[in-house]
Amino acid sequence: MDIDHVEFILEGVKLSFYSSPKYSPVKGAIHCLHNLFVADIKSIAAMKMEVMMRRSNFRDYYDIYSILKAGVPIQEVIALALEYSGHRLKTKNLLAMLTNGARFTRDAHFEQLAPIYQVTAQEIETYIKDCLIL
């Protein structure tokens, strides 16, 4: 890891964070344990969307789905992701990534993450499209 990338395992869940040197979407850190603070849920979703510029991991797509299922408004997360990327990420490109489930294939180790939802990339795509319509 580098100074701008850290990983933790908390209660069996691997948390990995990358910090852009110029931008941070975190508006309010949440105290977790001792001197450990974590990003708020909207910021996590924004970081997940931003990292999709560099990788197409199913777990990122799934995480975005889970966050949206928890009631976080997609429009707010999209705006935050665009800001976080320094506007290198464009709305049109982000929407194209989010609404193309074919980009995301479930890796062999995904089940080790003990997902709450049994959902396919196609089902996530449909859900995201529905969220965008509302």
For every predicted segment, state its role.
Residues 1-134:
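Compositionally biased terminal segments of proteins
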